[in-house]
């Protein structure tokens, strides 16, 4: 009898022990959906719907992660629609934005945060901390750049917890400040990274940090699906779940890894760049200094910058993406005043007769007293105003996201005329002269309006139907009765300024970046693949084409002329100077981030170049002494 009792209690003990072990070994189970690319009328809608229904059919998930690119074009309507679909999930979900949600955002990246309620998250489940943030690039075509606000947030997080980081992009050279990101992630205690962007499954490692990139929910002529992640105390598995009609299948894990703390093994130079940094480094500045290039001053803003300058006499004005307009001294860069507004600012301000004009994502066009920063007048649009204004003959010409191009009185903001039939939103600075107003939109179209009454003169449309191929980011230039524009189909188009007729196309010479010489005789354009081309504006022949040595580059920033120099900006914080015959003279690095529109002028002290980069760096160069 005692033997029976002993056997019984041993059995009970083993049973309870096994239950305890099982409880400890029960993993977190997470559904990860990424790259949804919601677009009304496309197959993406049914793909998302099927994935959401399937997630809801699973009985044992802990929560859902959404990895960005939830929309195809970042419109307000797309964001609202996909939010409605995701809200039908029966599990809690946490979301980050992707480049498609940010780059083509008609709201200036405001709507995503307003609709979903946050731009980053931080929560803990079963001993694991999950953090996620947006990746950029905000509004400008470039590699990803975690915004300064996101970097400040990462820097504020305390370490000491096992952490999983969720971001749309791989944290490699796809992200301009990748080395700052991974350094912070290691400090925090990150052990695993989850992302998307590539639309397919990949095992990754970022300076010792393990991670995965996962498939898109899109069927892509195959089957929709998503990812199941299981996370134990020190181990992770990643599996694809594919939806075959009414028969979903979760495949065996394609990724399995033990997770542990990762120490930083990277070495950094005095400028904070890692030893493996693959692009132009700051040592080019030493070479340029020997050729008479001097950095007069340089400082770091506490926010990103995604627009250019207005400058007059001894002052310059610029805006940050956090919504602050600043006035600084050109002598030493010291701040004279700053004012903060109700939305992000991507508009390059314009100065005229003591008035500073710019657009804001809060939907207003503002005119300030340039000396003091006080508001003289403001005019409301029904959506964000991301475009840059031009002033001519006491009138302000500016596009917006609400389908209306406006001409306003500089003095009081009263409406002179409106053109209310614009398709797509406007982000560019228009070309304006006494004959026409020319601007592009994110609906494949380029418009020419009469500057006196706003009547339509002509519309040109890109032959490629995707709205990604729009003449919208380029700042058009004009010479010899011709309009020159660059389109993301990698072509430079030359149009008759009077009729809009296409006169010539230069293939594979550019993406969105053009410029023009001071005398108007030469048009410059920059390709994605390290070439700079000079075109005779009258004869439409190529004068020269040179290798730039800058590698892959997708910056939309206009090429500038500084005296007899051609200044080519890049998306990696560098400028490269050429003479007017195409000879490379020198280069300068300001930061790792995209160079914004530049301002140049000559004085008795020499030629000057005012530059900012997207990470908030602002600097003034003097090129020679006279």
What kind of region is each of these model predictions?
Residues 202, 209-276:
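Binuclear metal-dependent phosphoesterase catalytic core
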Residues 39-42, 72-78, 99-107, 138-141, ...:
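Active-site environment of divalent metal-dependent phosphoester hydrolases
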Residues 288-310, 337-352, 375-392, 401, ...:
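Extracytoplasmic beta-rich repeat domains
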Residues 20-81, 159:
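N-terminal active-site segment of His-dependent metallophosphoesterases
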Residues 329-333, 369-372, 409-413, 450-454, ...:
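Short loop/turn segments that connect beta-strands within beta-propeller blades
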Residues 56-63, 131, 141-210:
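His/acidic metal-ligating clusters that form di-metal
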């Amino acid at each position: 009898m005692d033997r029976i009792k002993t056997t019984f209690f041993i059995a009970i003990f083993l049973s309870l022990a096994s239950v305890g072990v099982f409880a400890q070994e029960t993993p977190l189970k997470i559904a990860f959906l990424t790259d949804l690319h919601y677009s009304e009328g496309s197959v993406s809608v049914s793909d998302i719907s099927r994935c959401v229904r399937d997630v809801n059919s699973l009985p044992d998930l802990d929560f859902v992660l959404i990895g960005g690119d939830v929309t195809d074009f970042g419109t307000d309507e797309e964001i609202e629609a996909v939010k409605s679909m995701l809200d039908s999930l029966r599990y809690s979900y946490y979301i980050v934005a992707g480049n498609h949600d940010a780059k083509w955002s008609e709201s200036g990246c405001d709507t995503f945060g307003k609709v979903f309620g946050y731009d980053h998250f931080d929560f803990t489940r079963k001993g694991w901390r999950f953090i996620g943030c947006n990746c950029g690039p905000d509004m400008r075509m470039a590699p990803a750049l975690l915004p300064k606000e996101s970097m400040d947030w990462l820097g504020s997080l305390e370490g000491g917890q096992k952490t999983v980081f969720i971001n749309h992009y791989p944290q490699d050279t796809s992200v301009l400040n990748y080395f700052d990101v991974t350094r912070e992630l290691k400090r925090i205690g990150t052990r695993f990274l989850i992302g998307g962007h590539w639309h397919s499954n990949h095992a990754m490692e970022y300076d010792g940090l393990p991670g995965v990139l996962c498939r898109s929910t899109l069927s892509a002529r195959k089957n929709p699906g998503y990812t199941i992640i299981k996370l134990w105390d020190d181990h992770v598995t990643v599996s694809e779940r594919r939806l075959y009609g009414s028969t979903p299948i979760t495949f065996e894990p394609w990724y399995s890894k033990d997770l542990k703390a990762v120490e930083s093994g990277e070495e950094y130079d005095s400028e904070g760049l890692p030893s493996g940094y693959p692009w132009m480094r700051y040592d080019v500045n030493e070479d340029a200094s020997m050729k008479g290039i001097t950095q007069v001053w340089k400082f770091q803003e506490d926010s990103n910058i995604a627009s250019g300058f207005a400058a007059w006499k001894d002052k310059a004005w610029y805006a940050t993406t956090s919504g602050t307009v600043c006035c600084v001294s050109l002598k030493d860069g010291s701040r004279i005043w700053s004012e903060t507004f109700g939305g992000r600012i991507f508009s390059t301000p314009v100065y005229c007769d003591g008035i500073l004009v710019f657009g804001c994502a809060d939907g207003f066009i503002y005119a300030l007293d340039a000396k003091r920063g006080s508001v003289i007048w403001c005019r409301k649009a029904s959506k964000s105003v991301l475009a840059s204004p031009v002033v001519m003959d006491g009138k302000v010409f500016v596009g917006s996201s609400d389908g209306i191009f406006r001409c306003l009185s500089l003095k009081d903001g009263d409406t002179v005329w409106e053109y209310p039939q614009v398709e797509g939103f406007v982000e560019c600075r228009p070309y304006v002269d006494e004959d026409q107003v020319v601007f592009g939109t994110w609906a494949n179209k380029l418009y020419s309006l009469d500057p006196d009454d706003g009547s339509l003169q002509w519309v040109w449309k890109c032959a490629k139907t995707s709205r990604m191929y729009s003449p919208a980011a380029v700042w058009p230039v004009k010479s010899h009765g011709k309009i020159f524009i660059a389109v993301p189909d990698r072509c430079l188009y030359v149009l008759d300024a009077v009729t809009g007729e296409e006169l010539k196309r230069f293939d594979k010479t550019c993406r969105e970046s053009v410029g023009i010489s001071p005398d108007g005789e030469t048009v410059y354009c920059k390709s994605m693949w390290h070439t700079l081309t000079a075109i005779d504006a009258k004869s439409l022949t190529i004068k020269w084409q040179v290798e730039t040595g800058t590698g892959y580059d997708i910056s939309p920033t206009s090429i500038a002329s500084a005296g007899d120099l051609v200044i080519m900006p890049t998306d990696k914080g560098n400028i490269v100077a050429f003479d007017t015959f195409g000879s490379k003279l020198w280069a300068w690095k300001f930061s790792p981030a995209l160079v914004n529109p530049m301002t140049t002028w000559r004085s008795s002290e020499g030629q000057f170049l005012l530059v900012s980069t997207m990470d908030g760096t602002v600097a003034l160069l003097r090129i020679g002494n006279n």
